[in-house]
């Protein structure tokens, strides 16, 4: 794994109020640019890690202004040094496409195959992961942003060892966080991710600042789209916005609520063709999930489909999709699934 060698700092300059220690020769404009452009890599350190933060600041400065690296190259290198879990974002251009259902069941599939998994509800102002998971959290992201608790204190336990961080619902100000708040939240997520093998991000729908901010963390981005034409168009809009924002994660299409494979194929082909033609982007086909009464029944009963109907076609296809990200996660045996279903009955 790539290791960054911080620029030597001797003697260590006095800390500024914001925790950085720019060298006397640094231009103020450069300091401000680094603080704004790389905020997610400079936040989340406690007081005992101040020197680490200083070293990182100087390393960024030297790569940027001495070695001529681009901001994208620096961000990629910094991400490579983070010993953290793999970030998989589940997003959509339009609401009502089953995004949260996919995120919850995908995260649970990872947890069921033994991966340390965290599910983060990133639909900050209109969160509902906790509803589908059957949880009533005492602490949410709202408490974190109001500085009442640390992000790690907002983690709650779900089924199969799955851990979740729940959002708040109906809190308008969470849907309009400023850049500093979003960068601080991202920084805390990166620190917390060192304790997990995979972090699933259930983003909000659309292309708002909150959505794109979370997508900057993602190694892979699952774009959920349905056969509905508006959903397909909005899914392309999300991919295009990610391209224009220079999101580095790999995009993939998951066709949801399809009546059969042929209908799902149309969705995937439309999106992959448009991305290749107009954006010169290669977008993966992640598979498809059927429209099924059991899915809605599971949501209404506040349980995941993998718990309530583990042998269903939806559950089997979901595990296959999970195995595409983490090999071995599709091997949750049919016998184990049958036992769960029998117990539920």
Language-model segments: residues:
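Extreme N-terminal, non-catalytic leader segments
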Residues: 1-18, 23-46, 50-94
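Walker A/P-loop phosphate-binding motif and the immediately C-terminal alpha-helix
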Residues: 80-123
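P-loop/Walker-type NTP enzyme "switch/lid" segment
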Residues: 92, 119-194, 269, 293-304
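Inter-motif core of Ras-like GTPase G domains
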Residues: 211-229
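G-domain G4 guanine-recognition motif of GTPases
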Residues: 226, 253-265, 288-295
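Conserved C-terminal guanine-recognition region of P-loop GTPase G domains, centered on the G4
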Residues: 236-246
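Beta-strand-loop-alpha "switch" segments that mediate conformational coupling across diverse proteins
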Residues: 277-306, 318
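NTP-binding/hydrolysis catalytic cores, primarily Walker-type P-loop NTPases
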Residues: 300-345
